[in-house]
Amino acid sequence: VTARSEYRTTRNLSLNISSYQLVEAVSNEYVIGLGYKFTEFNKVLKMKQTKDFSNDLTVRLDFSYRKSQSLIRKIEDNFTQPTSGNIAKTLQLSADYGLSKTLSLRAFYDLQINEPLVSSASYPTSNSNYGISLRFSLAQ
């Protein structure tokens, strides 16, 4: 079993002296990931076992939540206005199965959801990707 968690933050400030404005860009992101490795998964599939290779299945699940926004602070008027920003949620699920020393099979699903914080900037979108890949490795 593997587990991970991350917290990332960024903040950029830009001062414009001629217009008395401070532009602030802030981003906060949380990431949570889980993984599990099923050793000798071919026993579950009731397949013939090889002597020198263990057919392992590795499953991973990652979720991230990121909020980013840009603000214009007018120093002279003591006024703050959001100009852009969004909330991005990402879900990634993958399973890797070793068929042999050089051949592996991978299935994956990715989901990305973007929601704007400022309604005039954009509209909510979601993208999903899924698929199966077969990898052949020449290195041993």
List the model feature ranges, each with a label.
Residues 1-140:
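Exposed, low-structure sequence patches enriched in small/polar residues
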